[in-house]
Amino acid sequence: GHVVVVGGGPGGLEAARAAAGRGHRVTVLDRADHLGGTARFSSLTTPMNGELVRWLSTAVAEAGADVQTGTTATAETVAALEPTAVVVATGAVRTRPDVPGANLPHVLSGDDLRGLLTGEDLGARRPGRLIRLVLAAGRLLGITDNLGRVRALSRRWMPIGRRVVIVGGGLVGTELAEFF
């Protein structure tokens, strides 16, 4: 059969690898230009996550899956592939904390920050024009494609204010604190 996997993060890549290993024809669709999802971004502070993404990406390619990055999956695009099965692995849904001010323009979620730093969503929380221009230039020049460069540059400059409060002391919050 033909398995279509929507989402190129670790869950989607593992589903694709497993399906291809069982003899299925596999197509992976991911709207981002790079595989890995949040794990790829988190490799900025936790390089092992990047190793996992590289391993899964290589395993999926070696298994013969058709990987289509920069492709938004819609009902029409998926149906056109005539799959016998569809796996939706689009990642976790995170919500903003229900606290006063959480929706103010200068308040960023981890997803907002990822969108800014990778250039994937420059309108995430409406940063100033200069910041959007700098980040757009970085994306056009390919700077945001290389997480090593993003890591090095983020040590010198972040597209947010000088005073930062991080809400949450779990893994993501502590990883994020390494930027500041």
Task: Describe each region flagged by the PLM.
Residues 31-39:
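NAD(P)-binding Rossmann-fold cofactor-contacting core
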Residues 39-41, 98-101:
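Short acidic, glycine/serine/threonine-rich loops at helix termini
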